Swiss-Prot record:
The lineage of its organism: Bacteria, Bacillati, Actinomycetota, Actinomycetes, Pseudonocardiales. Signal peptide: none annotated. InterPro entries: Ribosomal_bL12 (IPR000206), Ribosomal_bL12_C (IPR013823), Ribosomal_bL12_C/ClpS-like (IPR014719), Ribosomal_bL12_oligo (IPR008932), Ribosomal_bL12_oligo_N_sf (IPR036235). The gene is rplL. This is Large ribosomal subunit protein bL12. Belongs to the bacterial ribosomal protein bL12 family. It holds the Pfam family Ribosomal_L12_N. Homodimer. Part of the ribosomal stalk of the 50S ribosomal subunit. Forms a multimeric L10(L12)X complex, where L10 forms an elongated spine to which 2 to 4 L12 dimers bind in a sequential fashion. Binds GTP-bound translation factors. GO terms for molecular function: mRNA binding; structural constituent of ribosome.
Length: 128
């Protein structure tokens, strides 16, 4: 097998969906017995520094699916509608794997719109 350059690897990753990347990351962690989590000691100073800007209004939100509720099929349909390029299988895995982020770093209007649609379909959703 030919060795891929860093640029070629990045091109391959750019073509993958978020779910495919997540699956790859889990497999990579298991294969090499490593974890992608940041050390806790390194994250603590960043959190202290972030407390001051917290007074400003947040302009980027993550839409997190907490639970699909009783109407899982309806929620899957709405997830496919909200997340562009998501196939039925990926949407189903995303819904069944809740709690999981559906959208990341979106503006307030889009986050509220997605939250409303998901809640109308029976899902429990939070904005972070």
């Amino acid at each position: 097998m030919a060795k891929l350059s860093n640029e070629e690897l990045l091109d391959v990753f750019k073509e993958m969906t978020l779910l495919e990347l997540s699956s790859f990351l889990k497999e990579f962690e298991e294969t090499f017995d490593v974890t992608a989590a940041a050390p806790v000691a390194a994250a603590a100073p960043a959190a202290a520094g972030a407390a001051a800007p917290a007074a400003e209004e947040q302009d980027e939100f993550d839409v997190v699916l907490e639970s699909a509720g009783d109407k899982k099929i309806q929620v899957i349909k709405v997830v496919r509608e909200i997340v562009s390029g998501l196939g039925l299988k990926e949407a189903k895995e995303l819904v069944e794997g809740a709690p999981k982020p559906i959208l990341e770093k979106v503006d307030k209007e889009k986050a509220n719109e997605a939250k409303t649609k998901l809640e109308e379909s029976g899902a429990k959703v939070s904005l972070k």
